[in-house]
């Protein structure tokens, strides 16, 4: 059984330099809001970035994509899920359903053109869910080390699992930081599982980029996605020396090329 070793630092690679966009809020009522940045141009295609678990819109991939789109006149949106970054909500109170709802709110309220969605790690799961529910709007998908169903394979010890069953949560310590994994996160994840299906009814073109040295999500995950999706236009790009970060210049270049090709 492959275990996901999600770490806070694995998804919080900072983008060196100043902020490249003005942060705004999408107000959703009941004091809920999503923080986002968006290019001011209009274009035939809108690019949206779905980040990873405990990541935010200041991460390397999000900012690199945003800057690329800004300089090339492409409408682009990056944002923080509920309980992440500057958005409202407490991380440990949120679930896959909440983060999927964040994606839907952004897509429906902040974009109108056909979409190219870039999903990193957990964002790769959310981009597939969004493509299933908003298929007519999605022009293409780019998965960066996509991690569908990761809640089924979290690397927790027996004592952590016992604590979670007893108290509803456990603390995961990784890379000099700690965060809470809740039972409701795992239970809710079961509602959105994809890899247990015979076919995933996503029909749009997609590019999946995965590092062969990824010790968080095995690259075979992207191969499995490619087999299961209904789309006949799927490319899998394996980066032999790539880790889960995929934040090196080569991997970032592959991401931008994939976005360009899908536009």
Named regions from a protein language model:
Residues 213-217, 245:
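Acidic catalytic loop of the alpha/beta-hydrolase fold
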């Amino acid at each position: 059984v492959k275990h996901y070793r999600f770490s806070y630092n694995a998804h919080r690679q900072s983008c060196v330099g100043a902020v490249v966009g003005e942060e705004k809020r999408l107000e959703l009522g009941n004091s809920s809001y999503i923080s986002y940045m968006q290019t001011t141009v209009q274009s035939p295609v809108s690019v949206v970035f779905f980040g990873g678990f405990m990541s935010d819109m200041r991460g390397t991939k999000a900012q690199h994509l945003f800057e690329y789109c800004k300089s090339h006149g492409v409408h682009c949106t990056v944002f923080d899920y509920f309980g992440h970054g500057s958005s409202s909500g407490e991380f440990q109170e949120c679930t896959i359903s909440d983060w999927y709802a964040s994606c839907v709110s952004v897509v429906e309220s902040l974009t109108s053109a056909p979409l190219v969605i870039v999903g990193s790690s957990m964002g790769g799961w959310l981009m597939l869910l969004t493509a299933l529910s908003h298929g007519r709007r999605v022009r293409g998908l780019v998965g960066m080390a996509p991690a569908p169903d990761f809640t089924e394979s979290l690397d927790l010890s027996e004592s952590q699992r016992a604590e979670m069953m007893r108290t509803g949560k456990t603390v995961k310590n990784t890379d000099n930081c700690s965060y809470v994994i809740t039972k409701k996160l795992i239970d809710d994840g079961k509602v959105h599982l994809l890899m247990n299906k015979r076919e995933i009814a996503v029909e749009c073109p997609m590019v999946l980029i995965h590092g062969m040295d990824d010790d968080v999500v095995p690259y075979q995950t992207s191969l499995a996605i490619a087999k299961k999706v209904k789309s006949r236009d799927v490319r899998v790009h394996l980066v032999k020396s790539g880790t889960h970060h995929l934040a090196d210049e080569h991997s970032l270049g592959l991401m931008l090329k994939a976005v360009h090709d899908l536009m």
